[in-house]
A protein has these predicted regions:
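Solvent-exposed residues in well-ordered beta-strands and their adjoining turns
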Residues: 74-78, 136-138, 384-386
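General N-terminal leader/first-domain-start detector
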Residues: 1-15
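Short, structured patches in soluble enzyme cores that scaffold and shape functional sites
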Residues: 123-126, 135-137, 169, 211
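C-terminal lobe
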Residues: 130-143, 172
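Rossmann-like S-adenosyl-L-methionine
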Residues: 3, 143-145, 150-386
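Ser/Thr- (and often Asn-) enriched beta-sheet segments in non-cytosolic proteins
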Residues: 83, 118, 134, 197-201, ...
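Extended interfacial segments that mediate partner engagement and assembly in macromolecular machines
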Residues: 8-12, 20-121, 126-130, 141-142
Length: 386
């Protein structure tokens, strides 16, 4: 069974035929009702797929609506007709919608026609306190640069706390809002004004990450995510902590204080550079390396476990899951505890079967509602050796 089918099975009749755009199937519901649907759906998914250890109740999102810190609009310009091919969403902050309306009103004027024709996407990223705007363009010449600088001045003066604006050149005109993959260099990335990095304030420290890098879309749930991961992974003094798909080091820095050593791995070069800079600034003896996490990488690039010294592994792969052979090679390291984080629920059955096959059993399953209004969950699964 797929998780979206379980969601559909538990939806009230009046929302089953709802015309919710872009997968926001549950957005019309009151949040209390949405949680009831999701809790019933994850239990049904678990039962039908005969998975071990039923899930705990879902941890609710502190902000169930207007929570998204990243949003985007695809720009389509035809003679006499400018369109943003996405619509305002109640899952996005009102400030995002206001910025898009401001930009639309500028781009529709004759003076900004060259820029309107050049645009692929407009992206807004940031936090609940400030925003950064990225203009993804298919070409860049002197006239377009002038218009970008003019529109950047408008953003600086607007009341929506737009602290930076940048241009990203994507000549492929791809359907991805940055490009088919996130950029690993800065050749096509141009600064209009403001810092080139974003930051996440975690209270006792602040982490920087690249404006093109991956970050959690629901800032309001990050505290619950870290708290839950800390409890489930259970790092102790003397443990070696291996943080795979670490991004800019969120879990490495939030959980790694108790560990004897921390090694973070991420394929995205700019994010790893930010993690290294944070380690230097915080004077932490952490190590970060860049590389594609596949079977060969785990076998050949990761340092071998130290006999007699426990290792705990956290892996937070993309929605498609891990590459073939990764779980097997990680299990051969014999970590005392694994925390596997899933943002794609449908990947869970196959992954848990593989962990089981190589000597690990489920200890606890904890879903978080990281994506309110949509038929998706972030699920934390703690595993231990049999």
């Amino acid at each position: 069974m797929f998780f979206e089918q379980a969601i559909a099975n538990n939806l009230p009749n009046y929302t089953k035929e709802s015309d919710s755009a872009y997968g926001e199937t549950l957005a019309p519901l009151e949040y209390k009702e949405e949680l009831k649907v999701k809790n019933a759906a994850i239990r049904e998914f678990w039962d039908v797929n005969r998975l071990a250890r039923g899930p705990q109740p879902i941890i609710a999102s502190p902000m169930p609506r207007n929570y998204r810190t990243t949003s985007k609009r695809q720009v389509e310009m035809k003679p006499g007709d400018l369109r943003f091919n996405e619509y305002d969403s109640i899952l996005e902050p009102e400030e995002h919608n206001a910025i898009y309306r401001l930009l639309f009103d500028k781009l529709i004027t004759p003076a900004y026609k060259p820029l309107a024709y050049a645009l692929n996407w407009i992206i807004i990223r940031g936090t609940y306190k400030y925003r950064v705007v990225i203009f993804n363009v298919k070409k860049l010449d002197a006239s377009i640069v002038r218009k970008l600088k003019q529109i950047a001045e408008v953003l600086q003066q607007c009341p929506y706390h737009v602290t930076a604006a940048h241009t990203y050149v994507d000549t492929t005109e791809s359907n991805y809002y940055l490009e088919a993959k996130r950029p690993t260099d800065t050749l096509n990335f141009k600064q209009l004004y403001g810092p080139r990095e974003l930051s996440l304030d975690l209270g006792h420290f602040r982490l920087k990450y690249p404006v093109t890098g991956f970050s959690q879309i629901n800032e309001s749930q990050i505290h619950n995510l870290i708290k839950s991961a800390s409890r489930l992974l259970g790092l102790e003094k003397g443990d070696h902590f291996l943080d795979l798909y670490c991004g800019y080091g969120l879990f490495s820095f939030a959980l790694g204080e108790a560990a004897k050593s921390v090694l973070g791995v991420e394929w995205e070069g700019p994010s790893i550079d930010c993690a290294k800079a944070s380690a230097r600034f915080l004077k932490k003896n952490y190590k970060f390396i860049a590389g594609k996490i596949d079977e060969t990488f785990v076998q050949m690039r990761l340092p071998r476990p130290i006999p007699g010294e426990p290792e705990r592994i956290l892996l937070d792969p993309p929605r498609k899951g891990t590459e073939p052979g990764v779980i097997r090679t990680l299990a051969l390291r014999k970590p005392v505890r694994v925390l596997h984080i899933f943002c794609g629920t449908d990947e869970i059955p196959d992954a848990l079967a593989e962990w089981e096959r190589f000597g690990y059993r489920v200890k606890e399953v904890l879903p978080l509602d990281l994506f309110p209004g949509t038929p998706h969950l972030e699920t934390l699964v703690a595993l231990e050796r049999k």
